[in-house]
Amino acid sequence: MYKKILLFMIALLSFTACSANKEVSETENVSKNEVESKDDNKKNITVTTTFIEDMVHELIGNDKANIELIIPAGEDPHIYVPKPEDFNKLTEADLVLYHGIHFEGKMVDALEGVGYAVTESFDKNDIGEMEDAKDASSMVEDPHFWFDLDLYAEAFTNAANKLKELYADDSQMLALIDENHDRYLKELKDLDKYNGDRIAEIPEGQRYLITPHDAFNYFSRRYDMTVMAPQGVTTDSEVANKDLEDTAQFIADKKIKAIFAESTTNPERMEKLKDIVKSKGFETEVISGHGRELLSDSLADPGEAGDNFIDMYKHNVDLIVDNLK
C-alpha cells in the first residue's frame, strides 16, 4: 500500500506543481471542514465522479458512510487536474471506486494504484471505439459507457459487490445492499422502456443528435440514433475547422432543426457551428442555457434536475425528443 500511496503522491505533485498558492490555501480550508464533518465510526468511501457517487447513494444511502467525491458536479473529468486535498480523499479511504476506460484523464495512473474500476469486468467487445481526437489515424476506447444501460447495470453490480466486500462483517448492510441492488436494476429496466418509447416519438428521418463532443455513441448504439460531434471523444482537444464544416454541411443537408450544448462544454462552439450552418442556407437552433443542456460527463448539481442518474437520463431524452420531434 505504501508504494501505491507514493506513486499517487508523485502523480499528484506532477499535476499540481504549477497550481497557484491561492488554490492550495483554499483547498486546505475545505479539507479541514471535511475532516471535522466526518464520522469516525463510518467507513470512508471515495468516488471519482457524480455517477459513481450516485451508485453508492442508491446502494447504501447518504448516511451510512463518509462518501467523498473528487470531481465535483459540472466539472469535466477528461481534463480535471487533481488537487492537494484529493490525496487525503484517496489515501484515507477504505474503498476507492472509479470509472476506468481512461475517463478520469489526468488521474488514471494514480487511480489504478489505489482504487477499483467499476468497468473492470467489461468485455472488450462491449466497449466502443472512437477516433482519437489527437490522431485521426488511430482509435481509442470510448469511456462514456453509462449511456448503455446494460453496461451501467454491470458497473452498478460491480460497485455493489465491492461494497459487500467492504461490509462483509455487517449482515444488515449486506442485506441493504442486496435489496437496493435488485430494486435499482428494475428501475433501470423501466428507464430503458421509457427512453425507447419517447425516442419513438421522433420520426425516423429526424433522429439525428448533434452534440459538442462524442459522449453519446453508446446512446446511439442502444436507441438507433445517428450521433455526430465535431470534437471527438474528449473535451481537451481543439475543434478543427474541417470538422466544423463537415458537421455543418451534414446539418444543412439533413435539415436538422436543433443541435445541443452540453453542461461541461463551451456553448460558444455550438453557436459557431450554428453560424456556419446558416452560411450554407439552413437555420438550426442551439439548445442551451441553464436546465436546457445535455448532461454527459457529469450529473447536475445537487438539488437540480438531473442530479441522479435516472433523472439525468430522462432529462436528456426529454430534451432531445421535445426539440427534434
Label for each model-derived stretch:
Residues 2-23:
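Sec-dependent N-terminal signal peptides of Gram-positive bacterial secreted proteins and lipoproteins
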